Amino acid sequence: MSMGKVVQVIGPVVDVEFSLDTDLPDINNALTVDKGNDETVVLEVALELGDGVMRTISMESTDGLRRGMPVEDAGRAINVPVGKETLGRVFNVLGETIDGGEEFPADFRRDSIHRSAPKFEELNTSSEILETGIKVIDLLAPYVRGGKIGLFGGAGVGKTVLIQELIHNIAEEHGGISVFTGVGERTREGNDLYFEMKESGVLEKTAMVFGQMNESPGARMRVALTGLTIAEYFRDVEGQDVLLFIDNIFRFTQAGSEVSALLGRMPSAVGYQPTLATEMGQLQERITSTKKGSVTSIQAIYVPADDYTDPAPATTFAHLDATTNLDRKLTQQGIYPAVNPLESSSSALDPEIVGQEHYEVASEVQHVLQRYRELQDIISILGMDELSDDEKIIVARARRIQFFLSQNFHVAEAFTGQAGSYVPVKDTVSGFKAILAGDYDDVPEEAFRLVGNIDAALAKAKEMGYTQSEKAVDQD
């Protein structure tokens, strides 16, 4: 292996000089710096500066590095453990375990984090719906097995909680394998998620990879590739359907922006790296379904200052099959999950995929909510009395629909004191169909807030002192 030495350290950027008589390392190769006392730091080659000097990005803290320290070229990219043994374990960007358990032996199978996307002829398209048990998603923006889904929202609107609920529901109801990748988010949230999943028994079907916000930009930029590499093994070798959760894909872009500036590249719009679209494409094109298996990706996407035209979320949009948009106004109204039913969308909301009844109910729900939005200006200025009788009925049903789109989550039980609910798609469709038909016009609208199916809403109404009318009994 080629040997070099450290010649310059600027934060996470390390310049390494190799003799021109030896083979220079390739771009993306892993280099190891020996700090002494059995301590090493892993670098990744990013640029060749000339005269045998390679500019690298450190995957760890560069504290303690000095000029002249010996550097060894590994002759390959960073590689990480893959296989069934990774389930139930927690890794960092380098594939080292960080859960206090045993390290994987040196001869364990490892794959490179830098790989090509599957070839065109290997790809497979699927139109099978993935049931999540979350009403607003299953009804209005259904997820496709093997698709890419984006959870958009500003700070504190519930992206991470929604991802945790999806992991819980898919593990409990579908028994599927999941890979959770924490990219540049809070370490506390990752710690909470680990112990919650351990207690609920979901962890044994999940591999977790973390590169959190206190780590170097190199680690945050590459950790998504580490998680994806573990998921690709289950797809390509085991032939399984895998769920890949990334929280948060914006931090991947943000880390890339930091690295780009450190490498001296000229920034583009809003200070982002000029290679933004390329980096995003290289990651997203690997997240796909092949004839062997599928990777269904659910990505939380932070929207800076709630601005959807920002280049980071806008670049991500192009790769998605479905978008789930979280709205701060709904959190202020106490509607959770705060999914905006009019701005969320899915390519799978098609009668040939979800069925004619589901499609018609979803379309009518969106129509009623859109009409309610249009009437809100009149209501706020002139009051409800200025509406026609038909418009008053639309407003009443829209409010019931809006509340019924909310539900309690299993992962939030400790905070809310309310049991979470998983609602099958057929129950969701039949419930909204009955509300649209006017079967529950006399049921108090508050009864529909944060409940599971229609039966739960009627039980809540009964607790509120409501007695079913003969019409509702007949329809029920």
Swiss-Prot record:
ATP binds at residues 153-160. InterPro entries: AAA+_ATPase (IPR003593), ATP-synt_VA_C (IPR055190), ATP_synth_F1_bsu (IPR005722), ATPase_a/bsu_AS (IPR020003), ATPase_alpha/beta_chains (IPR050053), ATPase_F1/V1/A1_a/bsu_N (IPR004100), ATPase_F1/V1/A1_a/bsu_N_sf (IPR036121), ATPase_F1/V1/A1_a/bsu_nucl-bd (IPR000194). Its EC number is 7.1.2.2. GO terms for cellular component: plasma membrane; proton-transporting ATP synthase complex. It is a peripheral membrane protein. It holds the Pfam family ATP-synt_ab. Its main location: membrane. One of its GO terms (molecular function) is proton-transporting ATP synthase activity, rotational mechanism. It catalyses: ATP + H2O + 4 H(+)(in) = ADP + phosphate + 5 H(+)(out). It is found in: Cell membrane. Keywords: ATP synthesis, ATP-binding, Cell membrane, CF(1), Hydrogen ion transport, Ion transport, Membrane, Nucleotide-binding, Translocase, Transport. PANTHER family: ATP SYNTHASE (PTHR15184), ATP SYNTHASE SUBUNIT BETA, MITOCHONDRIAL (PTHR15184:SF71). F-type ATPases have 2 components, CF(1) - the catalytic core - and CF(0) - the membrane proton channel. CF(1) has five subunits: alpha(3), beta(3), gamma(1), delta(1), epsilon(1). CF(0) has three main subunits: a(1), b(2) and c(9-12). The alpha and beta chains form an alternating ring which encloses part of the gamma chain. CF(1) is attached to CF(0) by a central stalk formed by the gamma and epsilon chains, while a peripheral stalk is formed by the delta and b chains. NCBIfam families: atpD. Belongs to the ATPase alpha/beta chains family. Produces ATP from ADP in the presence of a proton gradient across the membrane. The catalytic sites are hosted primarily by the beta subunits. This is ATP synthase subunit beta. It comes from Latilactobacillus sakei subsp. sakei (strain 23K) (Lactobacillus sakei subsp. sakei). The gene is atpD.
